[in-house]
């Protein structure tokens, strides 16, 4: 039965991918990838700053296992590489270009050359080192172009944010962003109840929770990402709750974001979930939060820092 369930999940993923045209990544989506891959792959030792300096400059160095897996993380996150197909997706390059060509000022000829070079790259086993070796020559040749296409410069990303006020801005939490989208300035008392974790079940609250779950990367079009929710419990020093978190989510009836939200709020995990959810709200306003060495202390500290949120740029 487990094998059948896994197979059905995989087939569902493929069907979702096949039925929807690929969408270009905006500046928020790209920034999330870069910072998350830093979080997951930067070493904790004395050479951490060296890696960060090199990666910030888009240099895939040093040539070691750490950089290899960082490169795979970014390629996967930017959807240049598809792990399900174990293939580089060269057909997505012109889609990314067309979406932002008036802002990036990239040249069609160079984009075509980049696409051809990526199409010729062989992912082989799909391991970190194989992907690194396959993509490195492409990267070195087209690094300036790829930085333009995937919003990898401060100036370029700023132009995208300015041109797209409809996406979450830097310094704005996903909770605040989704509140604006769902309520459009109306029914403020209802959203305040939502902020207090009251389950009103209103269409606006359901829309807001769906938006937040997607923004925090708890969900995407393929379904719930349980590991991401577990990670948030780990980040508030509650890793021992992982089995219970997984159990609550697995036994939850329904498949919408609000369904899972209700299950967590109504479970014995409620207070810990609130702490994890609030801490992620803070981090969602500043994707460099953890990279600056900041860690979870307590709920009061999170509330204090939330009051200080502004539009300070952290890139």
Curated annotation (Swiss-Prot):
GO cellular component, one term: extracellular space
Signal among keywords: yes
Residues annotated for leukotriene C4 binding in this entry: 58, 152, 170
Chain residues that bind thromboxane A2: 55, 70, 170
Alphabetically ordered keywords of this record: Disulfide bond, Hemostasis impairing toxin, Platelet aggregation inhibiting toxin, Secreted, Signal, Toxin, Vasoactive, Vasodilator
Disulfide bonds listed in the record: 37-73, 69-128, 178-211, 252-263
Tissue-specificity statement: Distal-lateral and median lobes of female salivary gland (at protein level). Not detected in male salivary gland (at protein level). Expressed in female salivary gland. Not detected in female carcass without salivary glands. Expressed in male salivary gland and other tissues.
A GO term for molecular function: toxin activity
Chief location of this protein within or outside the cell: secreted
Single Gene Ontology BP annotation: sensory perception of smell
Pfam families: PBP_GOBP
Job description of the protein: Modulates blood feeding of female mosquitoes on vertebrate species by binding and sequestering different mediators involved in the host response. Binds leukotriene C4, leukotriene D4, leukotriene E4 and stable analogs of thromboxane A2, U-46619 and carbocyclic TXA2. Binds weakly prostaglandins: PGD2, PGE2 and PGF2alpha. Does not bind leukotriene B4, biogenic amines, ADP, platelet activating phospholipid derivative PAF and arachidonic acid. Inhibits agonist-induced smooth muscle contraction.
Family: Belongs to the PBP/GOBP family.
Name of the protein: Long form salivary protein D7L1
Organism: Anopheles stephensi (Indo-Pakistan malaria mosquito)
């Amino acid at each position: 039965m487990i094998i059948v369930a896994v197979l059905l999940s995989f087939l569902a993923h493929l069907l979702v991918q096949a039925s929807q045209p690929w969408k270009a990544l905006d500046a928020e989506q790209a920034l999330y990838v870069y910072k998350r891959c830093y979080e997951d792959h930067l070493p904790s030792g004395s050479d951490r700053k060296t890696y960060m300096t090199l990666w910030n400059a888009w240099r895939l160095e040093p040539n070691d296992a750490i950089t290899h897996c960082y490169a795979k993380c970014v390629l996967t996150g930017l959807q240049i590489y598809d792990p399900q197909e174990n293939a580089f997706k060269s057909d997505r390059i012109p889609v990314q270009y067309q979406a932002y060509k008036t802002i990036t000022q990239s040249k069609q000829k160079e984009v075509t050359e980049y696409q051809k070079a990526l199409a010729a790259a062989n992912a082989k086993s799909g391991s970190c080192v194989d992907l690194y070796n396959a993509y490195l020559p492409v990267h070195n040749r087209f690094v300036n172009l790829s930085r333009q296409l995937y919003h990898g410069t401060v100036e370029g990303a700023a132009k995208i944010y300015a041109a797209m006020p409809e996406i979450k801005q830097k310094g704005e939490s996903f909770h605040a962003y989704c509140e604006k989208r769902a309520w459009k300035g109306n029914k403020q008392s209802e959203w305040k109840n939502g902020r207090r974790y009251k389950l009103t079940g209103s269409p606006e609250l359901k829309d807001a929770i769906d938006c937040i779950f997607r923004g925090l990367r708890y969900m995407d079009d393929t379904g719930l990402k349980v590991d991401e929710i577990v990670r948030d419990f780990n980040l508030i020093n509650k890793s021992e709750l992982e089995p219970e978190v997984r159990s609550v989510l697995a036994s939850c009836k329904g498949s919408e974001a609000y369904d899972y939200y209700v299950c967590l709020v109504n479970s014995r995990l409620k207070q810990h979930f609130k702490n994890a959810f609030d801490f992620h709200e803070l981090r969602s306003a500043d994707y460099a939060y953890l990279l600056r060495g900041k860690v979870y202390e307590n709920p009061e500290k999170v509330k204090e820092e939330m009051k200080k949120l502004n539009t300070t740029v952290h890139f």
